[in-house]
């Protein structure tokens, strides 16, 4: 019986939304696919974290821009056969938490 291997990155930032990232969502999706990963979870820094999205934007526009890295990774993942999931990294009183299982709404 052959064993199937699944490899997921559970904490990944994109330059569309996280100030610390150096690559776009699409670039990251390609890099992880080439490295043999099954999927990734995009967890860009949220509002009170190290975000690159202008905090003075109206909320709806802020959320739209925050989601761009995920959307670009998701589109590229669909094209190349990589699973891509949505999450974010929230900061509260200096502690960071990864949030999974919610959607963009």
Give, region by region, the residue ranges found by the protein language model.
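A metal-dependent hydrolase metal-coordination microenvironment
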Residues: 2-105
């Amino acid at each position: 019986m052959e064993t199937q291997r699944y490899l997921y990155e559970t904490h990944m930032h994109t330059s569309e939304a996280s100030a610390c990232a150096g690559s776009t969502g699409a670039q990251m999706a390609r890099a992880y696919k080439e490295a043999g990963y099954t999927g990734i979870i995009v967890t860009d820094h949220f509002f009170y974290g190290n975000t690159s999205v202008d905090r003075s934007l109206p909320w709806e526009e802020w959320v739209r821009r925050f989601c761009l890295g995920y959307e670009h990774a998701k589109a590229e993942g669909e094209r190349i056969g990589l699973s891509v999931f949505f999450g974010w990294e929230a900061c509260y009183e200096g502690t960071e938490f990864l949030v999974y299982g919610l959607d963009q709404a």
